[in-house]
Amino acid sequence: MKQVKGGVTAAKGFEAASTAAGIKYKDRTDMALVYSQVPCVAAGTFTTNVVKAAPVKWDQQVVKSGAKAQAVVVNSGIANACTGAEGFGYCKDTADAAAKALNISADGVLIGSTGVIGKQIPIDKLTAGIKVLAGKKNDTLENGTEAAKAIMTTDTFPKELAVAIEVGGKTVTIGGMAKGSGMI
């Protein structure tokens, strides 16, 4: 395995974008999109806590259904946790908006939210942000880095990584981004 330059856009066929939708923050990006040009297998490791945020419940449903994923929409600033049925409904609204903007199935849209717990998502800002993200997405390394920055809350730096490995005699690139509260 060898580390290569980039993050979520390092692998062929993956695009990303970021935007400042005004979810919570002013004058900084707070939404990111990761998009796969083709539907792909999705897997997840989820909390075992009885309290789960709406996006966790949504993503568990998507993964359990066996649907192929094609997009991940993430917002920072409001976690959409402890928001009840309304918060889960906003996940459906988010998936529907992404499906329409990207011309894909809503069943293949994963959602991530990070930030303040117990506050409802401003869904109008979120769906408007999705339209912007869809228009800005591309496969540049810069867009991947900007997406990693957009999901930060109290993080001190964006976290992204890409590696190349040999599988069956072919080189495969895997890219990703992550966030963590107060990460050093």
Specify the residue positions occupied by each region the protein language model found.
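Alpha/propeptide regions of enzymes that mature by internal proteolysis
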Residues: 1-184
